[in-house]
């Protein structure tokens, strides 16, 4: 059992804020993290999020639907502005792409970057048409590891083997995006991703980047 209190929100938060100490624990812990190592033809998710964090404005808004890379995101991305993170957690599949468009429409003066797993992206891919049709300048980054990473992780924890239909071969998100009218790029390494992100962010238009990664 716990104690519960009924109090005015604004007054309560103001009083609580005065009692909170500023700490650097998170930054110190991040500094001690050893980033993941890229492969010859694919990036570690750490690399993807590091470059997103480096190249985007300080007030960028992140919309995230990539469950299996959550640790990489939180260990790498620095969020210091209110209202800068949106995620469905376990609320349902396909949230990320359309939600990013909604957030961008609601916050036209801030850049929205949507980091979406390839498994999740397939559940809401038609949102790209809306982005193109209404020129909503979201930058969509599809982390393409070729598998339902979250389900693979669950299988590992349950010591289940030979599970079918977890792989996602043969999906070309670059061609799909261009078919909807969204400029698209493919990045296999940090240099290619840096170039693609720089161009996409400067365009002021919707863009999709297929970032080739591996399940970690």
Regions found by a protein language model. Give the residues of each.
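Thiamine diphosphate
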Residues: 2-6, 13, 71-216
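N-terminal donor/sugar-recognition subdomains of glycan-related enzymes
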Residues: 5-8, 42
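Flexible, glycine/charged-enriched surface loops at secondary-structure junctions
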Residues: 11-28, 208
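Active-site diphosphate/adenylate-binding microenvironment
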Residues: 21-104
């Amino acid at each position: 059992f716990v104690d519960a209190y009924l109090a005015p929100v604004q007054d309560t938060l103001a009083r609580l804020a005065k009692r909170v100490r500023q700490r650097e624990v998170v930054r110190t812990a991040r500094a001690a993290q050893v980033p993941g190592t890229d492969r010859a033809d694919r990036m570690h998710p750490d690399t993807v999020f590091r470059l997103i964090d480096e190249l985007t404005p300080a007030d960028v808004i992140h919309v995230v639907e990539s469950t299996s890379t959550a640790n990489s995101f939180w260990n790498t991305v620095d969020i210091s502005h209110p209202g800068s993170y949106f995620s469905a957690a376990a609320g349902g599949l396909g949230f990320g792409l359309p939600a990013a468009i909604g957030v961008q429409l609601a916050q036209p003066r801030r850049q929205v970057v949507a980091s979406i797993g390839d498994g999740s992206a397939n559940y809401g891919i038609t949102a790209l048409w809306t982005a193109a049709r209404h020129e909503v300048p979201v930058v969509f980054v599809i982390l393409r590891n070729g598998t339902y990473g979250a389900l693979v992780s669950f299988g590992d924890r349950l010591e289940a083997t030979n599970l079918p239909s977890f792989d996602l071969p043969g999906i070309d998100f670059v061609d799909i995006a261009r078919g909807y009218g969204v400029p698209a790029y493919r990045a296999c390494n940090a240099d290619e991703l840096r170039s693609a992100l720089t161009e996409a962010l400067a365009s002021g238009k919707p863009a999709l980047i297929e970032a080739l990664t591996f399940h970690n």
